[in-house]
Regions:
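Absolute protein N-terminus
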Residues: 1-2, 144
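Solvent-exposed edge beta-strands and adjacent loop segments
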Residues: 2-73, 113-128, 134
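Short, loop-centered acidic/histidine patches that primarily coordinate divalent metals
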Residues: 72-74, 103, 138
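Short, cysteine-centered beta-strand-loop-beta hairpins and adjacent loop/turn segments enriched
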Residues: 75-78, 141-144
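Short, acidic/charged, Gly/Pro-enriched secondary-structure junctions
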Residues: 79-113
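Short, low-complexity, polar/charged sequence segments that are solvent-exposed and flexible
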Residues: 87-94, 117-121, 133-136
């Protein structure tokens, strides 16, 4: 059987402007993206009446987890900078809407509110100026 696998090349991560009719700007030079890591919390509801002594659980709340990604860090770029971009949002503790656009998956778009919780530059002598970023999802994501 032939594979139906798709390349993830061309996926975009976008940052919302917070406007009423929100506009999303593509975050410049995003490299690898990992996440979102969705999870369901559970509660153990095992009782003395549980069948054959097996643990019983119920689902409680859902969590959006986080999204981590690498960028070719461009400090003056509006989506990266300390005056208007990701670094400013982290320092200001600003919750923003983000979009993860996966064109290879029939244009799947995840939209989610998140906080920038990590911004770690890497400045190698023999290498490109990069940064690792982590977003913590702070509400319900939507899929379209």
């Amino acid at each position: 059987m032939a594979t139906a696998a798709k390349s993830s090349f061309g996926t975009y991560l976008k940052l919302g402007d917070g406007g009423t009719a929100e506009t999303f700007a593509t975050i410049a030079e995003v490299k690898d993206i990992k996440g979102p890591k969705l999870s369901l919390n559970t509660e153990d509801v095992t009782s003395h009446d549980s069948t054959d002594g097996w643990a019983e659980k119920i689902g409680t709340i859902l969590e959006g987890g986080d999204v981590s990604f690498e960028i070719n860090w461009l400090p003056a770029n509006v989506t990266h900078s300390h005056t208007a971009g990701l670094l400013k949002d982290m320092v200001g503790r600003t919750k923003r809407n983000f979009q993860l656009v996966v064109p290879a998956a029939a244009s799947l778009t995840w939209t989610f509110p998140a906080l920038v919780t990590e911004f770690q530059p890497e400045l190698k002598v023999k290498g490109a100026q990069t940064a690792s970023i982590k977003l913590e999802i702070a509400g319900k994501p939507t899929l379209a």
